[in-house]
């Protein structure tokens, strides 16, 4: 019986039990991308390392994780998806335990690399498993479950990491993965299975010579890019020779890889899928949403902690509220996507996010309180719920089911790369715009100007009443005005970047016209309508 006329495959166990099983490990993996952020000072102190050295605890994980994402589809096909997924869970769980035991920073970084390798295959594997386990008409709800894990985990990561570190020890942010990983291994072995068409593809691939050149090129390109994005701001970007050289290396490796993969009969990553308009547009959306989602996830706690003096746990709570709001919306969108044109849902989502960002730009100030921070994050993620599920659905439209691994792998990769680029660009833009605004404000608040004199005189009188001498009061007043200018200039940098993001998201709406809607087909991929 040919693939075209093969009866629809159904798993032996309830699809929802399978969905919950594969979501557990994915949730812990995504959680680990952010849970260590607030624990870095404790890790550095415990292991006698500087802040710059301890930052490699994050960078090492992100680099190895990013390398595995695009090649996970190839590895799934070669090894077998279930076997590959279980190997990833086992490696992630074991390396998490070893991270907790690490006696030195060097050993911790090494184990974090292994943890990133194991974790990199979990997101795309889960998405592919869900796509094959559920019929096309029910994928919306399945992807809603996946979305809960991907969105909630980074939102609560800093809060959970701060709470664990404050109440126990930083090593427990790694130990908590172990029992969940063991449970995931047991349930996966029991419930998950590879569909027949995937097994046939695996047998076919075994007789084909592996594309080691493509594998080497994409590894070099992604590792170089991730290091540039993570260390660029710290090294003054292209003012640093090694950042410039690494950027050139990454660009050339990507270009050569694209040409090589395009002409290779059995590539590691099937980039010819970008010839399909739905797939290409969905990946563009995934990349852009990654910029905004991860960028704002970086911006809000950064502003609350640095400019407003919030503790890390409290800043993390501002993100968690939005994550819980999205969890409430995802099942609703999952149900709507089979009844409403997904493109209309995405248009509503883009407009909602853009409006939320615009509102955020109007209230983002040094007087913003916690409730306002919670509200603006909730407005953003409310709109994102209307994009996440439909975008995942439309990415599969018209693509053979044998390519499900490739779709899920590339989707996760584009979102994560967009996030890395977004954080780097946003961080740099805030700094550069802030410097420009500070120069402008200093020029208009120089000694002698009425505004400057009124402010410094008022502060000086207050300090004198508190016991400071006239000279000390004047000097301290000048310092306080300078610090206020710095904070206000930085805030303006945030506001301008947020406004730019609002325009970018709104500009995505016309691109929906490129996509063709899906019409669920029984037992096969959704077909184009």
Locate predicted features:
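Short, Lys/Arg-rich, polar N-terminal cytosolic tail immediately upstream
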Residues: 1-10
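Hydrophobic transmembrane architecture of multi-pass small-molecule transporters
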Residues: 2, 53, 416-517, 526-529
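Transmembrane core module of solute transporters
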Residues: 13-79, 85, 100, 106-109, ...
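Residue-level hotspots within transmembrane alpha-helices of multi-pass secondary transporters
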Residues: 38, 70-71, 155, 159, ...
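Helix-loop-helix hairpins in multi-pass membrane proteins, especially solute transporters
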Residues: 69-214, 324
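Small-residue-rich alpha-helical segments with characteristic i,i+4
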Residues: 143, 152-158, 162, 373-457
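C-terminal membrane-cytosol helix-exit motif in multi-pass small-molecule transporters
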Residues: 179-198, 219-230, 249-263, 509-516
């Amino acid at each position: 019986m040919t693939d075209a006329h093969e009866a629809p495959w159904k798993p032996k166990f309830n699809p929802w039990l399978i969905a919950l099983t594969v979501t557990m490990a994915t949730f812990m993996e995504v959680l680990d991308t952010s849970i260590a952020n607030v624990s870095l000072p404790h890790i550095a102190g415990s292991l006698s390392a500087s802040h710059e050295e301890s930052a490699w605890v994050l960078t090492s994980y992100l680099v190895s994780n990013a390398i595995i994402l695009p090649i996970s589809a190839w590895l799934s096909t070669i090894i077998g998806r279930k076997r590959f997924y279980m190997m990833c869970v086992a490696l992630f769980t074991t390396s998490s335990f070893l991270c907790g035991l690490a006696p030195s920073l060097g050993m911790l970084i090494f184990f974090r690399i292994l943890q990133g390798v194991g974790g990199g295959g979990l997101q795309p594997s889960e998405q592919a498993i869900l796509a094959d386990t559920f019929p096309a008409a029910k994928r919306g709800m399945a992807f809603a479950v996946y979305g809960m894990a991907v969105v909630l985990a980074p939102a609560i990561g800093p809060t959970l990491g701060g709470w664990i570190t404050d109440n126990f020890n930083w090593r427990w942010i790694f130990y908590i993965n172990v029992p969940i990983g063991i449970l995931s291994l047991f349930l996966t072995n029991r419930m998950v299975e590879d569909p027949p068409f995937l097994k046939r593809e695996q047998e076919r691939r075994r007789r084909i010579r592996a594309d080691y050149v493509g594998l080497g090129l994409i590894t070099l390109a992604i590792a170089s890019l991730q290091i540039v994005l993570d260390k660029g701001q710290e090294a003054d970007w292209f003012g640093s020779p090694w950042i410039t050289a690494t950027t050139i290396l990454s660009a050339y490796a990507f270009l050569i890889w694209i040409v090589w993969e395009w002409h290779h009969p059995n590539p590691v990553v099937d980039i010819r899928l970008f010839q399909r308009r739905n797939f290409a547009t969905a990946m563009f959306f995934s990349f852009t949403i990654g910029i905004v989602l991860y960028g704002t996830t970086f911006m809000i706690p950064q502003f609350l902690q640095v400019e407003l003096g919030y503790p890390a746990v409290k800043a993390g709570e501002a993100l968690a509220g939005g994550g819980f709001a999205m969890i409430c919306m995802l099942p609703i969108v999952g149900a709507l996507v089979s009844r409403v044109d997904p493109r209309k849902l995405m248009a509503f989502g883009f407009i909602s996010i853009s409006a939320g960002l615009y509102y955020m730009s109007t209230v983002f100030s040094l007087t913003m309180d916690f409730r306002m921070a919670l509200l603006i994050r909730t407005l953003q993620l409310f709109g994102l719920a209307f994009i996440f599920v439909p975008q995942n659905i439309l990415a599969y439209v018209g693509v053979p089911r044998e390519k499900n691994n490739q779709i899920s792998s590339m989707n996760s990769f584009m979102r994560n790369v967009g996030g890395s680029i977004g954080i780097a660009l946003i961080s740099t833009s805030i700094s550069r715009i802030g410097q420009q605004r500070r120069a402008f404000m200093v020029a208009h608040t120089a000694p002698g100007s009425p505004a400057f004199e009124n402010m410094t005189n008022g502060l000086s009188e207050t300090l004198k009443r508190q016991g400071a001498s006239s000279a000390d009061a004047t000097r301290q007043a000048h310092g306080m005005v300078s610090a206020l200018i710095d904070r206000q200039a930085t805030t303006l940098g945030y506001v301008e970047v947020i406004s730019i993001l609002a325009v970018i998201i709104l500009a995505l709406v016309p691109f929906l016209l490129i996509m063709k809607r899906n019409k669920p087909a029984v037992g096969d991929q959704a077909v184009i309508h």
